[in-house]
UniProtKB/Swiss-Prot annotation:
It is an enzyme of class 2 (transferase). Keywords: Riboflavin biosynthesis, Transferase. Forms an icosahedral capsid composed of 60 subunits, arranged as a dodecamer of pentamers. GO terms for molecular function: 6,7-dimethyl-8-ribityllumazine synthase activity. It comes from Buchnera aphidicola subsp. Schizaphis graminum (strain Sg). InterPro entries: LS, LS/RS, LS/RS_sf. This is 6,7-dimethyl-8-ribityllumazine synthase.
Length: 159
């Protein structure tokens, strides 16, 4: 039986973080958590991290698609916050963002990890951006590091 598992130390990787400016007071904490995890735990040089700001979470997939198509990056981390309002707008934005990012990831064989919060209220978002519930940006970075290693191992098997 063959098993592929991987760690999170990735020294020579290039990563793009795409962050929404909408709800930036929350997203900046997610970004900070992601960068700290990539540099401190993953041992990635800051020069190897490209951070791109977009207006909102809905705009993340088009930039992710462009970046994935360049084939210059090992992973993409999507960061945004979608807070439920009084209409269904929340559901549409979240569903479209997640669906499109998943499709891009499988089309280009690039890990895209989700640091996108979908919460009922601002308090839940704050809690998930570095207080009671951890930092989902950091968790997305950890997933990206592990997936980079897994994808490298898969490529070695197929070459």
């Amino acid at each position: 039986m063959n098993i592929i598992q991987s760690g999170i130390n990735v020294k020579n990787a290039s990563i793009t973080i795409i962050i929404a400016r909408f709800n930036e007071f929350i997203n900046k904490n997610l970004l900070s958590g992601a960068i700290d995890t990539l540099t401190r735990i993953g041992q990635i040089d800051k020069e190897k991290i490209l951070t791109i700001y977009v207006p909102g979470t809905y705009e993340i997939p088009i930039v992710a698609s462009y970046i994935a198509n360049t084939n210059k990056y090992d992973a993409i981390i999507a960061i945004g916050t979608i807070i439920k309002g009084s209409t269904d707008h929340f559901k549409h934005i979240a569903n479209d963002a997640y669906s499109n990012l998943s499709r891009i990831s499988t089309k280009y064989f690039i890990p895209i990890t989700m640091g996108i919060l979908t919460t009922e209220n601002i308090q839940q978002s704050i809690e998930r951006s570095g207080t009671k519930m951890g930092n989902k940006g950091s968790e997305a970075a950890l997933a990206a590091l592990e997936m980079i290693n897994i994808m490298k191992k898969l490529k070695k098997i197929n070459n």
